[in-house]
Amino acid sequence: MVRAKRTKRASVTDIYRGCKAAGTCPPDVINKVEHTTIADKILQYGSAGVFFGGLGISTGRGTGGATGYVPLGEGPGVRVGGTPTIVRPGVIPEIIGPTDLIPLDTVRPIDPTAPSIVTGTDSTVDLLPGEIESIAEIHPVPVDNAVVDTPVVTEGRRGSSAILEVADPSPPMRTRVARTQYHNPAFQIISESTPMSGESSLADHIIVFEGSGGQLVGGPRESYTASSENIELQEFPSRYSFEIDEGTPPRTSTPVQRAVQSLSSLRRALYNRRLTEQVAVTDPLFLSRPSRLVQFQFDNPAFEDEVTQIFERDLSTVEEPPDRQFLDVQRLSRPLYTETPQGYVRVSRLGRRATIRTRSGAQVGAQVHFYRDLSTINTEEPIEMQLLGEHSGDSTIVQGPVESSIVDVNIDEPDGLEVGRQETPSVEDVDFNSEDLLLDEGVEDFSGSQLVVGTRRSTNTLTVPRFETPRDTSFYIQDIQGYTVSYPESRQTTDIIFPHPDTPTVVIHINDTSGDYYLHPSLQRKKRKRKYL
């Protein structure tokens, strides 16, 4: 079966051309071609009051106005994340040279008095081109708006040199230097030098010098001192001579107004005198193990319960609680922490007593507010800390070889230096020829000495003072080129090897069904080797 060919339908314009003359055009075709549809009429009436310019919003062509449509994401502007487009002016084509032009002179009028005979002359045409003027335009690269200082050129008369005035690239700016010093109260440098005139022992030193180093010309020094004015110096108070009274810091990170706290439902439930019984507890178990105050039971010390506790008991039996204040307590809430008007921390628990039980099984009892106020933590007296090896007074330098002690010894009384001896021997009992008088009874202490081994006599000696420190180890280096005796300390212990019996590690099983055990081949008795005759 062959499919019939589809005939192309006539357009609206072709139908309008054929039916307009006969007057048989449909209304929709006439409105479409003559632009009399409802949409066209709305635009016609609206354009009388509103002008949209050349936007092209009509039934005309969709050209987008004079500039045309701009696709989304494109345009002459700067794209997001891209390089800005630099707009450069168009380049004018350069003219290499003028074209060959033949100059033509204008026709001059003939003078009537001139002769009628015209002398012929050879006239040549100048076909050579004139001076060629070359014009080349260089378009500068567009730059940012920057201020450029242009030098000023001053020209004088003929024969004089030009003066070039170069201005500064930027005018000098006024600068101001400020210094601020902050003192750290947690760090204080303590000086050990002897305080001089006008110097304090703290970190803030004030040094006052008198002008005594110069020379006075033209008069005695007394006249200068008499005419000068003496300024009485006042002592500035140290920054540690006063105390800063700071306000009381807040007790909580987010303080709550007392009016809002007093209106809370929890506070009304705890401190309602008409509905809640107030009981002050003095037993410390109320803070950690309140269940031990209600009934005798075993508590797990590793478990801290901060939830509501319910105690079940048989009302037919009378049980005495460990604490009389917790009699008939059936329910005890979790701990609540509040603040008293005196500023103490109060631990509260809201409980309910099961005093009466009805026939229906309902238990009736009053609410009880158990509370305990925590005591004040007394502030311990501060302990004055002593600095180790430092002090703020005068420093004392002790030089042993320089200092000497003079001891007045009487020859007649050689034993007078002995401490605790009251009697003085007579001259007859003293042997002046004895060598015991020359003995030095001083005890030498070599606990802090150092042994130096060397043969050079030109070795420089560096004396290092020794200070008392809490550490026991001290390292003294006398000279880099000298000899140093080091005694290394070894703490390696010798491993003790315990003897073990020589038992083979390989066990050989023997298929022996005669017994329920087996012997190692090394434990079996060796058989004697017999010679056969």
UniProtKB/Swiss-Prot annotation:
Q: Cite the GO molecular-function annotations of the record.
A: DNA binding; structural molecule activity
The name this protein carries in UniProt is Minor capsid protein L2
Q: Which UniProt keywords apply?
A: Capsid protein, Cytoplasmic inwards viral transport, Disulfide bond, DNA-binding, Host endosome, Host Golgi apparatus, Host nucleus, Host-virus interaction, Late protein, Microtubular inwards viral transport, Phosphoprotein, Viral penetration into host nucleus, Virion, Virus entry into host cell
The family database entries (HAMAP family) matched by this protein are listed as: PPV_L2
- Describe the PTM: Highly phosphorylated.
Q: What is its main location?
A: virion
Q: Repressor among the record's keywords?
A: no
| UniProt GO cellular component terms | host cell; host cell endosome; host cell Golgi apparatus; host cell nucleus; viral capsid
Q: What stretch of residues is annotated with the motif Nuclear localization signal? A: 1-10, 525-532
The signal peptide stretch is none
| Gene Ontology terms describing biological process | microtubule-dependent intracellular transport of viral material towards nucleus; symbiont entry into host cell; viral penetration into host nucleus
**Which family is annotated?**
Belongs to the papillomaviridae L2 protein family.
Organism name: Human papillomavirus 9
Instruction: Give the protein's function.
Output: Minor protein of the capsid that localizes along the inner surface of the virion, within the central cavities beneath the L1 pentamers. Plays a role in capsid stabilization through interaction with the major capsid protein L1. Once the virion enters the host cell, L2 escorts the genomic DNA into the nucleus by promoting escape from the endosomal compartments and traffic through the host Golgi network.
Q: List the disulfide bonds.
A: C19-C25
Looking at the record's lineage, which domain of life comes first?
Viruses
InterPro entries per the UniProt record, alphabetical: Late_L2
User: What subcellular locations does the record give?
Assistant: Virion; Host nucleus; Host early endosome; Host Golgi apparatus
Q: How does it assemble?
A: Interacts with major capsid protein L1. Interacts with E2; this interaction inhibits E2 transcriptional activity but not the DNA replication function E2. Interacts with host GADD45GIP1. Interacts with host HSPA8; this interaction is required for L2 nuclear translocation. Interacts with host importins KPNB2 and KPNB3. Forms a complex with importin alpha2-beta1 heterodimers via interaction with the importin alpha2 adapter. Interacts with host DYNLT1; this interaction is essential for virus intracellular transport during entry.
